């Protein structure tokens, strides 16, 4: 029996989050900063357990380099979900520990996350990054900060036949 298989764990299916600060569970001292993954358990059926591995400042690259995807791989099993939301930190060219090219390394990294889920009979779901709060002036929000990463994620979802949730 392989690690993470449905037979080795409780019957409860799990939703794993692999993401950045927009999903991270935050300490009460950072309130009102709240990640999606922090409140997500309030909106899922009780038979699902949410396993939030999201971490502030992570990109697809740094998440994998730090062993965070490996930690998910050791636990994920048949019938589980892997929600994958990155882009905010992948675009940081000034930081080689996080930066990925949208239409090459970013897409390749997303495919690694997808493969981990599928190799364990879990369901990968790609989720586009949220728009940054970058204002053009006092009233108007600028748009398009992540457009290449959103387009790359959409292409990856289509190529790999996996669902995509577009929050952009």
Language model regions located:
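Short linear motifs at secondary-structure transitions and domain/linker junctions
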Residues: 25-29, 57-61, 138-140
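Short, solvent-exposed coil/turn linker segments
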Residues: 9, 58-59, 166
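Alpha-helical cap/lid subdomain in secreted, periplasmic
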Residues: 67-168
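Serine-esterase "nucleophile elbow" of acetyl-processing enzymes
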Residues: 1-55, 70-78
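Cell-envelope and extracellular/periplasmic
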Residues: 15-17, 21-23, 44-46, 53-59, ...
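Generic serine detector
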Residues: 5, 21, 59-62, 104, ...
């Amino acid at each position: 029996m392989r690690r993470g298989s449905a037979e080795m764990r409780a019957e409860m299916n799990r939703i794993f989050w692999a993401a950045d600060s927009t999903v991270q569970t935050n300490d009460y001292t950072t309130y009102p900063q709240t990640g999606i993954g922090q409140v997500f358990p309030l909106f899922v059926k009780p038979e699902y357990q949410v396993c939030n591995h999201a971490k502030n400042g992570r990109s697809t690259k740094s998440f994998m380099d730090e062993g965070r995807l490996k930690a998910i791989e050791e636990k994920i099993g048949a019938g589980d979900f892997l929600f994958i939301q990155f882009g905010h930190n992948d675009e940081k060219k000034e930081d080689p520990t996080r930066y990925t090219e949208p239409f090459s390394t970013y897409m390749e990294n997303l495919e690694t996350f997808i493969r981990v889920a599928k190799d364990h009979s879990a369901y990968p779901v790609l989720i586009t990054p949220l728009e940054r709060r970058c204002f053009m002036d006092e009233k108007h929000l600028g748009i398009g900060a992540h457009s290449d990463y959103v387009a790359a994620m959409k292409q990856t979802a289509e190529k790999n036949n996996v669902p995509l949730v577009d929050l952009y």
